[in-house]
């Protein structure tokens, strides 16, 4: 599994003869998550967070995001979260997040490999078909402050030097995005 910006991705490599068991397990996991190993997994994420703090790529990305999007989640936290949140997590908040965002109208299943597509669709219907959609809260954030001049941030690290440049534009649907 991994997270990045606006996605959480779970990757599984399943033999064709175990597809039904996979659908059964995944439907249970997504519909009724039980966080038994929560603290063990949290330690792994926190260690990944700590390691990432020393990586030049992460440091430069964080500096660029903070500069370009200071009042947007991209600029206020990393994809791994904030250290203080990882130190003091709330299982209630995590369950609430799952309940709000892990809903069928906000999830996609992509499969490739040696299987019968019609049989897979039937399995998806069997195990996920009665899962009810819910409204997803709109993604809201504060308007970004205007950038009226070039901003340079210097980030120092242990790797070979490089230059990273970024521009803010009107959005993915704008003409500027095609440049």
Language model region names:
Residues 31-36, 116-118, 128-134:
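Bacterial peptidoglycan biogenesis and beta-lactam-recognition machinery
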Residues 12-42, 175-177:
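M16/insulysin-pitrilysin zinc metalloprotease superfamily fold
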Residues 11, 23, 27, 46, ...:
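Short, well-ordered alpha-helical packing segments
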Residues 42, 91-127:
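Non-catalytic, conformational "gating/processing" segments within enzyme and secreted inhibitor domains
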Residues 1-18, 51-106, 130-174:
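Non-catalytic beta-strand/loop surface segments
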Residues 42-49:
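Short amphipathic alpha-helical coiled-coil/interface segments
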């Amino acid at each position: 599994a991994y997270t990045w910006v606006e996605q959480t991705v779970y990757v599984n490599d399943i033999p064709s003869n175990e597809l039904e068991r996979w659908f059964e397990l995944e439907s249970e996991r997504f519909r009724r998550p039980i966080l038994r190993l929560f603290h063990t997994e949290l330690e792994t994420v926190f260690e990944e967070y700590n390691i990432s703090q020393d990586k030049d790529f992460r440091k430069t990305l964080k500096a660029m995001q903070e500069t370009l999007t200071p009042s947007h989640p991209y600029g206020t936290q990393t994809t791994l979260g904030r250290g203080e949140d990882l130190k003091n997590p709330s299982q209630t908040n995590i369950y609430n997040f799952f309940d709000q965002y892990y809903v069928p109208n906000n999830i996609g299943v992509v499969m490739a490999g040696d299987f019968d597509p019609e049989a897979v669709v039937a399995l998806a219907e069997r195990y996920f078909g009665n899962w009810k959609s819910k409204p997803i809260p709109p993604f809201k954030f504060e308007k970004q402050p205007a950038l009226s001049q070039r901003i340079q941030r210097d980030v120092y690290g242990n790797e070979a030097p490089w230059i990273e440049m970024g521009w803010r534009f009107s959005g993915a649907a704008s003409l500027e995005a095609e440049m």
